[in-house]
A protein has these predicted regions:
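Detector for glycine-centered tight turns/loop "hinges" at secondary-structure junctions
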Residues: 34, 49-52, 98-101, 150, ...
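Short acidic/polar inter-strand loop motif in beta-rich domains
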Residues: 93-106
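Hydrophobic residues positioned within well-ordered beta-strands of beta-sheet architectures
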Residues: 25-27, 40-42, 57, 72-74, ...
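Low-complexity, acidic Ser/Thr/Pro/Gly-rich terminal tails and inter-domain linkers that flank the onset
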Residues: 1-32, 36, 41, 49-50, ...
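Intrinsically disordered, low-complexity Pro/Gly/Ser/Thr-rich segments with frequent PxxP/GP/PP motifs
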Residues: 50-85, 97
C-alpha cells in the first residue's frame, strides 16, 4: 500500500538513486498547478532491502523553476551506500513564485495500491494500446480511481490529474479485456495485409 496527498501540487514522478558519480538522489517532480514552483521541501527516507530505514533527510530545494504542468528536477545531496535499495519521498512544503505556500497535512493522505505492471508482454500490450506513459491497468479503489498512468484520482474527478485522460475512456479502452481486443484486431489487420 502507498499513500498520496491528492492536494499536493508537486507530484513525485520519478526517482534516481545516489551513485558514486552523482552523490545525490535526483527527484523528478511534476507541477500539477497553474503557478510556478520556486522551492520544495522534501523528507527523504533511505531504505534497505527489507524496507528498513537507514537514514532520514529533510531537504529544501531553492531557486527551482517548476513551470506549470511540467516536470522539474530536485537534487537531494546524499551519499550512496551498498545497503541502500530504495527511497521513500514525501513532499512536505511547496513555495510558489507569488510567495504563496502549500503544506502537507497528514490527514489528507489516502491509501491506494499501485497498479504498476512488471516488464512483461502484458505491459508491452498496454503501452501499445495506451501509449508509453502507461504503467498498469486502471482500477477502482476506496473512493479513488487509479489511471493507466499510475496516478490515483478522486472518484468524482472526470480526468486524470497527471495525464489528463478521461476516466470513462481509461476504463473502456485500457482494461485487460479491452487491450486484448485491440491487440487481436491489430493482429487480424496485419494478417490480412
Amino acid at each position: 500500500m502507498n499513500y498520496i496527498d491528492l492536494s499536493c501540487p508537486a507530484e513525485l514522478f520519478r526517482t534516481a538513486m545516489p551513485t558514486e558519480e552523482i552523490p545525490a538522489a535526483t527527484l523528478t517532480l511534476f507541477n500539477r498547478s497553474d503557478r510556478v514552483i520556486v522551492s520544495v521541501e522534501v523528507l527523504l527516507r533511505l531504505l534497505d532491502e527489507d524496507g528498513g530505514e537507514t537514514e532520514r533527510l529533510a531537504y529544501r530545494g531553492r531557486a527551482l523553476n517548476g513551470r506549470p504542468h511540467s516536470t522539474f528536477l530536485l537534487t537531494v545531496p546524499c551519499a550512496p551506500s551498498e545497503g541502500l535499495k530504495a527511497l521513500d519521498v514525501s513532499v512536505e512544503k511547496v513555495w510558489y513564485a507569488d510567495n504563496e505556500t502549500w503544506r502537507r497535512d497528514p490527514a489528507n493522505a489516502v491509501e491506494y495500491t499501485p497498479n504498476a505492471l512488471p516488464v512483461s508482454p502484458a505491459l508491452t500490450n498496454l503501452k501499445y494500446a495506451a501509449g508509453e506513459t502507461a504503467v498498469g491497468y486502471p482500477s477502482m479503489q476506496n473512493g479513488l480511481w487509479v489511471c493507466v498512468c499510475g496516478r490515483p484520482n478522486p472518484e468524482g474527478e472526470p480526468c486524470c490529474a497527471r495525464c489528463g485522460r478521461q476516466m470513462e475512456t481509461v476504463f473502456s479502452r485500457f482494461t485487460p479485456e479491452a487491450v486484448e481486443t485491440q491487440i487481436s484486431l491489430r493482429e487480424r489487420q496485419l494478417a490480412t495485409s
